[in-house]
Amino acid sequence: MVKGPGLYTEIGKKARDLLYRDYQGDQKFSVTTYSSTGVAITTTGTNKGSLFLGDVATQVKNNNFTADVKVSTDSSLLTTLTFDEPAPGLKVIVQAKLPDHKSGKAEVQYFHDYAGISTSVGFTATPIVNFSGVVGTNGLSLGTDVAYNTESGNFKHFNAGFNFTKDDLTASLILNDKGEKLNASYYQIVSPSTVVGAEISHNFTTKENAITVGTQHALDPLTTVKARVNNAGVANALIQHEWRPKSFFTVSGEVDSKAIDKSAKVGIALALKP
């Protein structure tokens, strides 16, 4: 259903996915099965040092309605109900997490050829109200993201962003934390098998800068390698292989050049789907 400029979260997303997606510092395993009625059940386990986290997620789809229920080892139950296009261009999402009775919220998204709007409100007496809006086209868009705390009467956050796409190049500029932090990102397809990207952030309060550059290259249609490095001297690399349709095996590593005497961090992820 997504059309036009999309939602505010799309601003800078290509660069973020290139630089941060799929990098893993832990051991993660997930397997998805489907019942004869089409119900999808995904079991996930993550080993974080001496801590093991797990969850079981169930998804049921019926026409434009989707129900997701996830039970985690922290004794929480997350339920998400999605109604896709109850009216043209509209999506409604209702979510609640137990036992946290303050976590419930409803979100409405609207997609137009020249705009994308999302607004959400929590199910509490004094909720936090979120609003984000983007206007423009697939090539040029401008948006804002605002959260207002009705209890304190203050803005929780106020962000603004700009996105530009032309042919194989995408660039974005985002002002975060009520104007305290500026992020600029760049993403470019340099060949059918290779992309490069970078992200630069500046904090106006602390005067600190952060730079991350990365690349991705497809060795073959089923195998991809990625690498990134930042100005703190931390380098990451991964290799991901799709050994069967929708099933991925990923190995990633991290080395800190300023603490070379310490062992490198290695992460492994295995996702199985029928």
Swiss-Prot record:
GO terms for cellular component: chloroplast; chloroplast envelope; mitochondrial outer membrane; mitochondrion; nucleolus; plant-type cell wall; plant-type vacuole; plasma membrane. Expressed in leaf tips, anthers and stigma. It comes from the Eukaryota. Disruption phenotype: No visible phenotype under normal growth conditions. One of its GO terms (biological process) is regulation of seed germination. Gene3D superfamilies: Porin. Forms a channel through the mitochondrial outer membrane that allows diffusion of small hydrophilic molecules. The channel adopts an open conformation at low or zero membrane potential and a closed conformation at potentials above 30-40 mV. The open state has a weak anion selectivity whereas the closed state is cation-selective. This is Mitochondrial outer membrane protein porin 3. It comes from Arabidopsis thaliana (Mouse-ear cress).
